[in-house]
A protein has these predicted regions:
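Extracellular glycan-interacting surfaces
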Residues: 1-350
């Protein structure tokens, strides 16, 4: 197991549910310690990043831009970020240059730093047409970089499908037409907050690419997991119902160490009391239940250690539940956040 590994949880309020002051932000605990520390207070936090080459540097995506720590999360300072009050929902480190980091925002914008997150600039707006209405602005929920074409980026949008860039984020192309076509199938129709039954397919939460199958882009959305092998022109249902009784896809991540391993967080719905983490060791062809715990809320996030494959952590909504394994899934430990903290959105470790 990697030494001096910290665990981080990002907490925010659920849409339409007021939160009490002090119950949001970033919590930190050492992997061998039972106590959580509230290290960033008052700012709702939807995304976390432990820098993969320097774990001293930790990023929090908040409702007021990017906050940065250079002491393993003991303290945070607001980065030199160009916009006030901008919600940050995702981060991506460029595999070619660890100094370059992307941040995805709501309303949709992409920001980039070329100095390890000290300062940021807003890239040209992607200009993707909104295809569904929602009680919130569209969010850039996750970004991923192609393993062998590093200028090729993909982003999962909530609620607006997928977009692709071929020039390191300067311009973007809509990749959602086939997701909308798939929504014509009875089992893939879903409408909760908008006037289109394509809403469920456009409800993108996460996106990943495994190095073992670099031309397969995997999307986690409300209707399950979907796969594209032609840069987002077409999508195929990965039929997660064959492997899991619940199929609401909230997170999908590729292992940093194993080229063929993927992890997916599946639950019943955005607001639910059950869920599980599934692992594929063949680049998404087959899946098996990985965790050995009972959650009481939707699993919102899977946190993978940058260098230690045995460490995996999950965070579930509503009861401040964090669970972790440090032995590759053989045993699991409950690590609940202090009450009344509830709505976990992100977990990370390193």
């Amino acid at each position: 197991m990697a030494k001096r590994s910290n665990i981080y949880a990002g907490v925010a309020g659920y849409v339409g549910r007021p939160e009490e002051k002090g119950n949001v932000g970033v919590f930190r605990r050492a992997a061998a310690d039972a106590a959580w520390q509230h290290v960033l207070t008052d700012l709702e936090t939807h995304a976390l990043l432990v820098h993969p080459t320097d774990p001293e540097v930790v990023f929090a995506g908040t409702v007021d831009g990017v906050w940065r720590s250079t002491d393993r999360g003991a303290t945070f300072q607001r980065a030199r970020f160009p916009d006030q009050g901008k919600q940050i929902w995702s981060f991506l480190v460029d595999a070619r240059d660890p100094r370059r980091i992307y941040a995805g925002a709501s309303p949709v914008d992409i920001y980039r730093s070329d100095d390890r997150g000290e300062s940021w600039r807003r890239l040209p707006n992607p200009g993707i047409k909104d295809r569904a209405t929602a009680p919130f602005a569209v969010r850039v929920m996750r970004m991923v970089q192609h393993p062998t074409r590093p200028d090729e980026l993909y982003a999962a949008l909530e609620v607006n499908g997928v977009m692709r860039s071929g020039d390191a984020g300067e311009t973007w192309t809509d990749c959602s037409a086939d997701l909308i076509r798939l929504s014509e199938r009875p089992n893939l129709r879903s409408k909760i907050v908008s006037d289109t039954y394509a809403e469920g397919m456009l409800d993108g939460h996460a996106i990943a690419i495994s190095a073992g199958d670099p031309d397969a882009v995997v999307l986690a959305c409300r209707m399950g997991l979907f796969r594209s092998t032609d840069r987002g022109q077409s999508w195929q249902d990965m039929e997660m119902h064959k492997f899991s009784p619940v199929t609401y896809g909230r997170d999908v991540r590729a292992s940093p160490q194993d080229a063929s391993t993927l992890y997916a967080a599946l639950s019943v719905a955005a607001a639910s009391t059950d869920g599980g983490v599934y692992r594929s060791q063949d680049a998404g062809k087959t899946w098996k239940r990985f965790d050995k715990v009972q959650v009481h809320g939707t699993i919102m996030s899977v946190g993978l250690h940058p260098t230690d494959p045995d460490q995996v952590y999950i965070g579930a909504r509503y009861k401040g539940e964090v669970f972790g394994t440090q032995d590759g899934g053989a045993t699991w430990e409950a690590m609940p956040l202090p009450e009344p903290v509830k709505d976990i959105y992100a977990v990370a470790c390193g």
